[in-house]
A protein has these predicted regions:
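Active-site beta->alpha N-cap acidic-glycine motif
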Residues: 15-122, 228
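Short, small-residue-biased leader/transition segments that mark boundaries at the very start
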Residues: 2-13
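A structure-centric signal for secondary-structure junctions around beta-strands
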Residues: 9, 31-32, 187
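Catalytic domains of cell-wall/extracellular-matrix polysaccharide-remodeling enzymes
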Residues: 70, 92-192, 196-214, 218-219, ...
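Short, flexible hinge/linker loops that cap or flank conserved catalytic cores
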Residues: 3, 27-30, 185
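Gly/Ser/Thr-rich beta-alpha loop segments that engage phosphate groups in nucleotides
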Residues: 10, 43, 68, 132-133
Length: 235
């Protein structure tokens, strides 16, 4: 008690200041980041997606496929406008690419070479068709992950999605709600959407999604080397 009573006001202020600094510090280190990702493009609506992103000064990540030559110029626009171009699949034919290890490797390498030839970018990020937790692959997923590691590729899954390619007929508002019910649980959220002609509601939902994420304090970023590795399957 004597020691407590002998403490001066200076000690109290020091403790309060220290507590305040600690509280402020703890607030400043909590950085909320959202990553908008689009699978399966380019498509006829990729240009509209890029226009909306530009209007909102937001960068995203496009996990693209390679089967449609008329969309190849869109790869260049994605890169030129500062977005991350990433590998999804050349063919996107699950029954083929997951039938054997060699098929998987050939599919990845074919698209990686194509993207380099068209854009000059050596893409270093990958998303498994169906995600790394897919139940289609005939090859152990860890073997495929070992290949990606050896090829200098980092794979990303997601922890929020709008279900645009799963449930038809959803409104743009419903798509946003689907995302936020999961995304708001995380400081770092990777959001799965699709760049497909059948998913135009996703395009319509984008302005509202961007605004609501920003209202909740998220910084919207493209995937890069600093992005947390949100992965469904790990070694």
């Amino acid at each position: 008690r004597d020691a407590q009573e002998s403490r001066g006001l200076g000690d109290v202020y020091k403790r309060q200041d220290s507590d305040s600094v600690a509280a402020m510090s703890s607030k400043t280190v909590t950085r909320k980041r959202a990553y908008l990702t689009f699978d399966d493009g380019p498509s006829d609506q990729t240009g509209e997606i890029l226009d909306i992103l530009k209007e909102h000064n937001v960068k995203a990540t496009f996990f693209v496929i390679g089967r449609n030559e008329r969309y190849y110029p869109m790869y260049k626009r994605i890169v030129e406008e500062g977005h991350t171009l990433a590998i999804h699949s050349y063919s996107h034919e699950y029954s083929t690419i997951y039938a054997s290890y060699d098929n998987f490797v050939n599919d990845v390498e074919e698209l990686r070479k194509l993207l380099y030839d068209v854009t000059g970018v050596d893409c270093r990020y990958y998303r498994f068709p169906g995600g790394s937790s897919n139940r289609v692959t005939q090859v152990p997923v860890n073997d495929l992950i070992d290949y990606l590691d050896s090829a200098g590729l980092t794979y990303f899954d997601w922890n929020a999605l709008n279900n645009d390619a799963v449930i038809a007929g959803q409104t743009p508002d419903q798509l946003v709600k689907n995302i936020l019910k999961d995304a708001l649980n995380y400081d770092d959220t990777i959001i799965l959407m699709h760049d497909l002609d059948c998913c135009h509601e996703t395009v319509e939902s984008l302005p509202s999604l961007i605004e609501q994420l920003e209202e909740h304090g998220y910084e919207i970023l493209p995937i890069d080397d600093d992005t947390p590795h949100i992965q469904h399957r790990t070694h």
